[in-house]
């Protein structure tokens, strides 16, 4: 059962759940909290690689990822990031989120943006128990027009679901946690699997 708005506010008040900066009550809806777009992005460079062998030797996968991923792009608040049709880009939420070991989060895109072709997460919308950091967004423009995305705009909504008990291996305590405390648009670390 997901937390309702009253429970989300109570968990925030009690410090069991942390969203920083804390959203105003107007952004806490029936069962979700609206989140905004941060100012950090990462794109794919133009490249000539025919493919990336995701299960190949780790050093080759790492080198291939370094060749195709851009450095992090940091925008001023007044600037826009343009996502063209058929492009994939990474970004982050403005808010940093910390979940306790007995709560899982879910990220959903906004229907109004989806109707323009913007996918906010390609597949990864679960936020693990014990997570702490900004949420990486996997943008894909499936529409026909470039989309101007600006830091601070409403980009998605988080919902929260209590677990039957605290996780034995929450994300923040796992040795293999590749994205612990991320604050930027961190590229894939599949080579660390």
Curated annotation (Swiss-Prot):
GO terms for biological process: dUMP biosynthetic process; dUTP biosynthetic process; nucleobase-containing small molecule interconversion. Its EC number is 3.5.4.13. The keyword Metal-binding does not apply. This is dCTP deaminase. One of its GO terms (molecular function) is nucleotide binding. The gene is dcd. Pathway: Pyrimidine metabolism; dUMP biosynthesis; dUMP from dCTP (dUTP route): step 1/2. Catalyzes the deamination of dCTP to dUTP.
């Amino acid at each position: 059962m997901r937390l309702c708005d009253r429970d989300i506010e109570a968990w925030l008040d009690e410090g069991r759940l942390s969203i920083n900066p804390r959203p105003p009550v107007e952004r806490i809806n029936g069962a979700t909290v609206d989140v905004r777009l941060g100012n950090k992005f990462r794109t794919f460079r133009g490249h000539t690689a025919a493919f990336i062998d995701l299960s190949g030797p780790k050093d080759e996968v790492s080198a291939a990822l370094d060749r195709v991923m851009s450095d992090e792009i940091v925008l001023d608040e007044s600037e826009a990031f343009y996502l063209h049709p058929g492009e994939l880009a990474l970004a982050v939420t403005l808010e940093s989120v910390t979940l306790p070991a007995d709560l899982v989060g879910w990220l959903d895109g906004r229907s109004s943006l989806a109707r323009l072709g913007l996918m906010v997460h390609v597949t990864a919308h679960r936020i693990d128990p014990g997570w702490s950091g900004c949420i990486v967004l996997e943008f894909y423009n499936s529409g026909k027009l470039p989309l101007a995305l600006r830091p601070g705009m409403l980009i998605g909504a988080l919902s929260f679901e209590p677990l039957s008990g605290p996780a034995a291996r929450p994300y923040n305590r796992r040795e293999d946690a590749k994205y612990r405390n991320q604050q930027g648009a961190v590229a894939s670390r599949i080579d660390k699997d």
